Amino acid sequence: IEELNLLLIGIMIRRLKKDVLKDLPDKIRTTVPIELSNRAKYDRAKKDFLAYTLQEHGLKKAEKASNAEGVVKKGALRRLAIEGKMKGIIDWLKDFLEDNVDEKIILFTIHKQTIKDLMVHFSDVAVVIEGDTPAKERTKIVEKFQNNKKVKVFIGNMMSAGTGITLTASSTVCFLEIDYIPNEFLQAEDRAHRIGQKDSVNVYYFLGKDSIDEEIMIDILNPKMSVFNRVIDGKSESDTNIFETLMEGRDEKTK
């Protein structure tokens, strides 16, 4: 990694957004812990998976699974996590919209079912961009969110709406599901945190308590971000290593 960093230093110049766009407001990140409403179902699924891994691959593989490497490959646990979070998420969003009547909010998701569940409650005030949304429609949807005061909620699939659009009408970004690629979160955050934004941007990461969400954050996203920082900056400590900071903040809240 150190050799790669030295090589990159000789062929590239990295300019940080905070240095180039110094007038941008702050970005404030927070975790929102959510109790799983399907706790028993989730725990059974995880127990069954770990038992299967132990039987098939031995203790070491099972230990890795409990730390997310094996579990992550099982999308069923991720789907159970968001299924169990939905009630808490819906309640949180309704409270936000009631308490902030003049504000808009951006929601990023992964699964199609999550979007369907959200639209049951917010279809009258929401717009959606997902993978099969035509390019021409995307432009209209973004313009509607940016300019129509009646539209309060933007719901986007992170892969489809996390880059290439401007959503500065809102200063609140929410990640309802946790994926494995750290830079996808940073890119998606910046749909609101970009030129034209006048307010501090609040970013919320919704984590299912004692679930795969926390395991991905600790065991996958944090190490990946550290490796990225070492390759690009030559050090693992960086203000871009957001996931370690987020989890430290979560731990402080629970003390």
Task: Give the predicted meaning of each segment.
Residues I1-E103, V203, L221-N222:
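Inter-lobe coupling linker of SF2 helicases/translocases
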Residues V32-I34, I129-G131, F206:
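Hydrophobic residues at beta-strand termini and immediately following loops
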Residues N38-A40, Q113-T114, P134, S160-G162, ...:
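Conserved nucleotide-binding/hydrolysis micro-motifs of P-loop NTPases
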Residues D43, K87, K116, V120, ...:
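Alpha-helical elements of the RecA-like P-loop NTPase motor core of helicases
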Residues I105-I106, I141-F145, T172-C174, Y180, ...:
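A generic "structured core" feature
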Residues I106-F108, K116, S123-A161:
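Conserved helicase ATPase core of P-loop NTP-dependent helicases/translocases
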Residues I165-I178, V201-Y205:
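A short beta-strand element within the Helicase C-terminal
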Residues Y180-T254:
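A conserved SF2-helicase RecA2
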